[in-house]
Amino acid sequence: MTGKEMFEKLGYEKTCHDEREIIYSIYSDNVFIAEIEFDLQNQTFYCAFLDEALEVGMKTLKAINQQCRELGWL
């Protein structure tokens, strides 16, 4: 299963993919809830829940790790 498929299974949708970043976001009733952003230039990622840090569960961590593998970071 790809990182994108794993994120989609968790309810995320890919909202951006360009030369600088990949962003997966979750919305509830069209209201932004959380996002995971991969910075392709700096090979970093961050997780945000509204304006705070996002608690990352093991299924989400597995999706993050899979995406990092696909990007060649791991």
Locate the predicted segments by residue:
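Negatively charged, low-complexity tracts enriched in Asp/Glu with abundant Ser/Thr
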Residues: 1-24
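Short acidic DE-rich linear segments
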Residues: 69-74
